[in-house]
Amino acid sequence: MRKKPLTIFSDGTLTRRENTLYFESAKGRKPLAIEGIYDIYIYGHVNITSQALHYIAQKGILIHFFNHYGYYDGTFYPRETLLSGDLIIRQAEHYLNKEKRLFLAKSFVTGGTKNMERNLKNWGIKAKLSDYLDELNDARKITEIMNVEARIRQEYYAKWDENLPEEFKIVKRTRRPPKNEMNALISFLNSRLYATIITEIYNTQLAPTISYLHEPSERRFSLSLDLSEIFKPIIADRVANRLVKKGSLKKEHFREDLNGVLLTEEGMKIVTKAYNEELQKSVKHPKIGSNVTRQRLIRLEAYKLIKHLVGVEEYKPLVAWF
C-alpha cells in the first residue's frame, strides 16, 4: 500500500479504538487506515485524544497544523529514530564556520534562481535571472545573500505576471495577509510545501532546526525554509500557474478576510488535490537512472546535503531539467 498524505478540513476528533484510528465529526465516525498514512495536515478545529496521539507517534507520522486561514501553525514531531550525534555536530560546524555557511546559503539561492529561470522559460517568458549570480557569489554576508535573493524573486514575480490572467496578477508579493488572489494561492502552497519538506527531513538524520540561509530559530524548522528555496519554483509555483491558467480556480474560490484575501475551504481542497498530484508526478533521474517522484526529489536533496556535511561529496543544488 502506497502511503498518502491525509488532509483534514472538517472539525472533529481523532480517536483510537484498539488498533484503529478514527476521525469523528458531525458526519459520523470514519476509520482511517493508519498504515496508509504518510503524514497528516489539519486545517479544521480538531481534537486529538492522547491514545490517538501515542499511536500516531509510534508509527512515526508527523501532524502539521494550519489555522483557519491556511497559515502554518506548527508540527507534531514524533521522537526521532534516525538521530546521529556526529551529523548534528557536522551541521552545527557548517553553521558556525562562516565560509562553510556562505557556501550552502549561496547554493540554495543559486538552485532556486535557476529553477525560477527554468519556469519562465517553460512558460515562454524571456528573463536572465542568472545575471544576478555574479553578485550572489561576491556576497560576504548572509544579509547580502538575502538581499540578492529578494531582488531575484521580485524580478521573477514581475516576469511571471506578464503571463498570468488579468484577474490573477501578483502585482506585488504580499503576505499575512495576502492582498489578492494570486498572493493567497502562492502563500497557501508555500506553507504546504514547507510542511512537506519537514516530513522529508524527519525521515533523514538531519536536525531540522540547524539551517544556513535562514537564521536558526527556537520556533521554526528553518532547514525546511532553506530547502524550500529550491522547490518552491518547481512544485508550488508550477501548481499555482497551472490552476489559474486552466481555470480550475476562480474568483469564487477566494474570500476577503483579515484585511486581505484568502482561499475558501473549497478553494483549499482544489489546491491541495492539485498539489498532492504534483508531488506524485515522476521524472527520470539522470544520475539514478530510474523514475522518481517530485516528493522523492526532496528527500534526495536532503541526502545530498548529508553527503556534503560529512565530507563525502560537495553539495550541488537540484536544478530542474524537467
From Swiss-Prot:
E.C. number, please?
Answer: 3.1.-.-
Single Gene Ontology MF annotation: metal ion binding
Q: Name the UniProt key words of this record, in alphabetical order.
A: Antiviral defense, DNA-binding, Endonuclease, Hydrolase, Magnesium, Manganese, Metal-binding, Nuclease
| Cofactor(s) for this UniProt protein | Mg(2+); Mn(2+)
- Tell me one Pfam family matched here: Cas_Cas1
This protein's source sits in the domain of life called Archaea
Key word Cell inner membrane present: no
GO BP, sorted A to Z: defense response to virus; maintenance of CRISPR repeat elements
InterPro entries named in the record: CRISPR-assoc_Cas1 (IPR002729), CRISPR-assoc_Cas1_C (IPR042206), CRISPR-assoc_Cas1_HMARI/TNEAP (IPR019858), CRISPR-assoc_Cas1_N (IPR042211)
Residues binding Mn(2+): E149, H214, E229
**Gene3D superfamilies, alphabetically?**
CRISPR-associated endonuclease Cas1, C-terminal domain, CRISPR-associated endonuclease Cas1, N-terminal domain
Return the CDD domains for the record. Cas1_I-B
Described by its record, this protein's role is as follows: CRISPR (clustered regularly interspaced short palindromic repeat), is an adaptive immune system that provides protection against mobile genetic elements (viruses, transposable elements and conjugative plasmids). CRISPR clusters contain spacers, sequences complementary to antecedent mobile elements, and target invading nucleic acids. CRISPR clusters are transcribed and processed into CRISPR RNA (crRNA). Acts as a dsDNA endonuclease. Involved in the integration of spacer DNA into the CRISPR cassette.
Quaternary structure and interacting proteins, as annotated = Homodimer, forms a heterotetramer with a Cas2 homodimer.
Q: Which family does it belong to?
A: Belongs to the CRISPR-associated endonuclease Cas1 family.
Q: Please state what the protein is called.
A: CRISPR-associated endonuclease Cas1
Q: Which organism is it from?
A: Pyrococcus horikoshii (strain ATCC 700860 / DSM 12428 / JCM 9974 / NBRC 100139 / OT-3)
- Source lineage: Archaea, Methanobacteriati, Methanobacteriota, Thermococci, Thermococcales
Q: Which gene produces this protein?
A: cas1
